[in-house]
Amino acid sequence: MEFSSKLIEKAVNEMSQLPGIGKRTALRLVLHLLKQPKEQTGFLSQALLNMREDIKFCENCHNISDTKVCEICANSVRNHQTICVVEDIRDVMAIENTGQYKGIYHVLGGKISPIEGVGPSQLNISSLVEKVKSGKVVEIIFALSSTMEGDTTNFYIYKQIAESEIIISTIARGISVGDELEYADEITLGRSILHRVPFEKTFKNN
């Protein structure tokens, strides 16, 4: 792709680094921004800078937050004895949009994947185990994607907390194998949470 301006070329190259954005789409976005008032582009740039510099991760659940503790964990109305274990922040957003879950979350930051070189030590697993050991947790709900990596991660965590006297469940398999939670429709995802099943049944029946 040829550019008549090095500035445009640099902007397109940076924009195309975003997931799902190719060079042609990046060019359309850059040209759109070029047509906008300078202050509008400034607002966008400042918003992105503020997000990158000031965003925090909740010290309790690892969700994104503007403060040390996220709004969900700080909400005394939520059920703090039930923890929904998810892969990343997009899953928190997807589940929250269902309006069916009233507990809190624990964001792992990924899933175990030997192929990609991701092991348990690179995920937020130890802090979850510590929460269970504290004796304040009644139920853990696994809500990872139905993939080999997701199932491996679930089973690894299960082995770490199996001896504790808590309920360990997983969302019902209303979501197709291999699907990510963020792409599930709200009704299906909401039902899968409400109709969650004991985790032991998922591997004893296999």
Curated annotation (Swiss-Prot):
The gene is recR. GO terms for biological process: DNA recombination; DNA repair. It comes from the Bacteria. This is Recombination protein RecR. Keywords: DNA damage, DNA recombination, DNA repair, Metal-binding, Zinc, Zinc-finger. Belongs to the RecR family. The keyword DNA damage applies. Gene3D superfamilies: 3.30.60.80, 3.40.1360.10, 6.10.250.240, RecR Domain 1. GO terms for molecular function: DNA binding; zinc ion binding. Residues 81-176 form the Toprim domain. A zinc finger (C4-type) spans 58-73. NCBIfam families: recR. May play a role in DNA repair. It seems to be involved in an RecBC-independent recombinational process of DNA repair. It may act with RecF and RecO.
